Amino acid sequence: MSEADNKPVSATVELIAQDRPEHRPEHRFSSRSIRSFVLRQGRMSGAQQRYLEDMLPKIGIEYRPAPLDLDDAFGRSAPKILEIGFGMGETTAKIAAAHPEQDYLGIEVHGPGVGAMCKLVAENGLANVRIMQHDAVEVMRDMIADGALAGVHVFFPDPWRKARHYKRRLIQPDFVALVAQKLAPGGYLHCATDWEHYAHWMLEILAAEPLLQNTADGFAPRPDYRPLTKFENRGLKLGHGVWDLVFRRR
């Protein structure tokens, strides 16, 4: 365990909390100088590129600093679930296929992941998936109406393990407050991580948000709708932990 992990989570979270709007002249989201990701596009395969070029014009939504009509974007009225950082798309595709009665808006900044997700959507005929390739904080802030979401998934975000990088973690007090604002009453925020320090960090921040209520006594059992990933299965066999948190909007 690193020296950073030996520091009390509460003390570190308090330092981050001092960066909330009431402690600064400008809202932290008004200028996105600190982001929770580093844009490393990597190499896109030929198949990913082809599917991206073919599918993104059909299922992609461009970022605009204006409210998005989600029902219009999906062509129907149904519960809307937003997933932040869908990676290569396997989990999102499995959940969307298992729940055709719900619509899924996936956000990912990395091109190969977007291409892979486009491929999965095409191969599985998923009519209930839309994709955005943009900063999720800006999408949430500028395009999602208050109370519009039935759920938000944040699965295995970058833990930013070094203490000096904690400010880059996606789960921060201000962001959780923003997510809670976008959830409909009874809607949920589901986070999952395989990094223990980040798990406790998440738990403390989510528990401190007055609009959210924990559905469990601490960490939650993995909900049936979240499939195990290959990486997660391998880690569990090696004795590594995975922590789920599910909070509902009051």
Curated annotation (Swiss-Prot):
CDD domains with a match to the protein in the record: AdoMet_MTases
Domain of life: Bacteria
EC number: 2.1.1.33
InterPro entries xrefs: SAM-dependent_MTases_sf (IPR029063), tRNA_(Gua-N-7)_MeTrfase_Trmb (IPR003358), tRNA_methyltr_TrmB_bact (IPR055361)
Entry's Gene Ontology molecular function annotations: tRNA (guanine(46)-N7)-methyltransferase activity
Any one Gene Ontology cellular component term annotated for this protein: tRNA methyltransferase complex
Active site: residue positions: 158
Pathway(s) this gene product operates in, as recorded in its UniProt entry: tRNA modification; N(7)-methylguanine-tRNA biosynthesis
Enzymatic reactions: guanosine(46) in tRNA + S-adenosyl-L-methionine = N(7)-methylguanosine(46) in tRNA + S-adenosyl-L-homocysteine
Binding site for substrate: 162, 194, 229-232
EC class of the enzyme, as a word: transferase
Residues bound to S-adenosyl-L-methionine: 83, 108, 135, 158
Record's keyword terms, sorted: Methyltransferase, S-adenosyl-L-methionine, Transferase, tRNA processing
HAMAP family assigned to the protein according to its UniProt record, in alphabetical order: tRNA_methyltr_TrmB (MF_01057)
PANTHER family: 3-DEOXY-D-MANNO-OCTULOSONIC-ACID TRANSFERASE/TRNA GUANINE-N 7 - -METHYLTRANSFERASE (PTHR23417), PENTACOTRIPEPTIDE-REPEAT REGION OF PRORP DOMAIN-CONTAINING PROTEIN (PTHR23417:SF14)
Family statement drawn from the similarity comment of this UniProt entry: Belongs to the class I-like SAM-binding methyltransferase superfamily. TrmB family.
Protein task: Catalyzes the formation of N(7)-methylguanine at position 46 (m7G46) in tRNA.
Full protein name: tRNA (guanine-N(7)-)-methyltransferase
